[in-house]
Amino acid sequence: MTISQRTAAILVAAGRGLRAGTGGPKQYRAIGGRTVIHRALAAFSEHPDVAVVQPVVNPDDIDVFNAAVSGLRHEVPAHGGATRQASVLAGLEALVPHRPDIVLIHDAARPFVTSAVISRAIQAAGKTGAAIPVVPVTDTIKEVTASGDIIATPERAKLRIAQTPQTFKFEVILEAHRRAARDGLTEFTDDAAIAEWAGLTVATFEGDVANMKLTTPEDFVREEARLAAQLGDIRTGTGYDVHAFGEGDHVWLCGLRVPHSKGFLAHSDGDVGLHALVDAILGALADGDIGSHFPPSDMKWKGASSDQFLKYAIERVTARGGRVANLEVTMICERPKIGPLRDQMRARIAEISGVDISRIAVKATTSERLGFTGREEGIAATASATIRLPWSA
């Protein structure tokens, strides 16, 4: 049996994250252009040696969870409990039908876990049966009284900071959690503590200082700055598209169905705004153009909605570890009038792309009655896209 056939992971994501400030549960907040939970879940769902990924979420968050992790491999979420410990037990019980040998238990609030740490976790569990990732303590630690007076200075060389994923033989940690629940012990703060209480020896392995837990607003600010510093390859691409009018009673523009006296002559839905944006993004990536990715000769794209083209282009950026810094599109036409629809178009582009609306501009102009747009024979659009990539991409 291969490692990938017997290893499961639990992603604990049922907390409310109140200390992280406003904006909802911290696991659904964006950092570096992706939600925290998407980053954490992707690390496990994309790891070749993890066969089953079991999320545990608050039942009130099912819809937002599904939207945040769309496209990633995972099981149907288990419903979390009142404490982290209860949520982990729910995840373990959900894994029983899968009969894994090893389980990795990870906090969704640690979105920067690497494939290397996950691999070390799997190897450690196979050797010892129970192990956790740790990093050295670099500050001097003081033990204090309730009033704040120092009573001891622990020897720093013996101290370690515990991280996740904490990894165990599945049946062993399942039984330990069940025993703790039966005994009414509900306040363990991590799974290693439960294993210790159950009499298990818990080993350690090398963690990663970047695998930090996001807890406070300051954590988000610091990590946003760190991620931005890594994306030093700043690129800008441009795009252009045009479609002639034909029979019809509406046109698609920037993802909106706009009533009009004519329709577009086009292979897909003819959305010139989104097509220009897609070309701009692909140009910034030096990754061809919309025609090379979605050839008009392919009947698969006949009448296709252009929102899928924009999502695809954004995914190409994300796949290279990048993020979109700005999207701008200018519509060139006499009619329909773009001004009244500008904010709706920005909102729709934001919805499709996942880019914050503050980074999206929609503009409009005419050709002063000159040329085919002036004669109202069609609509043109120009676009630009600025993206940030790591230099290695």
UniProtKB/Swiss-Prot annotation:
| Coiled-coil regions listed | none
Which annotated residues bind 4-CDP-2-C-methyl-D-erythritol 2-phosphate?
A: 241-243, 267-268, 289-291, 365-368, 372, 375
Q: What Gene3D superfamilies is this protein classified in?
A: 2-C-methyl-D-erythritol 2,4-cyclodiphosphate synthase, Spore Coat Polysaccharide Biosynthesis Protein SpsA, Chain A
Catalysed reaction(s) here are: 2-C-methyl-D-erythritol 4-phosphate + CTP + H(+) = 4-CDP-2-C-methyl-D-erythritol + diphosphate; 4-CDP-2-C-methyl-D-erythritol 2-phosphate = 2-C-methyl-D-erythritol 2,4-cyclic diphosphate + CMP
Does the UniProt entry include the keyword Transferase? yes
Q: Name one GO molecular function term.
A: 2-C-methyl-D-erythritol 4-phosphate cytidylyltransferase activity
**Residue ranges of region 2-C-methyl-D-erythritol 4-phosphate cytidylyltransferase?**
1-234
Question: This protein's superkingdom?
Answer: Bacteria
Please state the Enzyme Commission number of this protein.
Answer: 2.7.7.60, 4.6.1.12
Record keyword DNA-binding present: no
Q: Where does a divalent metal cation bind?
A: 241, 243, 275
Site (Positions MEP for the nucleophilic attack) residue list: 156, 213
Which residue stretches belong to region 2-C-methyl-D-erythritol 2,4-cyclodiphosphate synthase? 235-393
Which cofactors must be present for this protein to function?
A: a divalent metal cation
A Pfam cross-reference name: IspD
HAMAP family, alphabetized: IspD (MF_00108), IspDF (MF_01520), IspF (MF_00107)
What this protein is reported to do is described as: Bifunctional enzyme that catalyzes the formation of 4-diphosphocytidyl-2-C-methyl-D-erythritol from CTP and 2-C-methyl-D-erythritol 4-phosphate (MEP) (IspD), and catalyzes the conversion of 4-diphosphocytidyl-2-C-methyl-D-erythritol 2-phosphate (CDP-ME2P) to 2-C-methyl-D-erythritol 2,4-cyclodiphosphate (ME-CPP) with a corresponding release of cytidine 5-monophosphate (CMP) (IspF).
Against NCBIfam families, the record matches this protein to: ispD, ispF, PRK09382.1
Homology family: In the N-terminal section; belongs to the IspD/TarI cytidylyltransferase family. IspD subfamily.
Protein name, please? Answer: Bifunctional enzyme IspD/IspF
Natural source organism: Bradyrhizobium sp. (strain BTAi1 / ATCC BAA-1182)
Q: Which gene encodes it?
A: ispDF
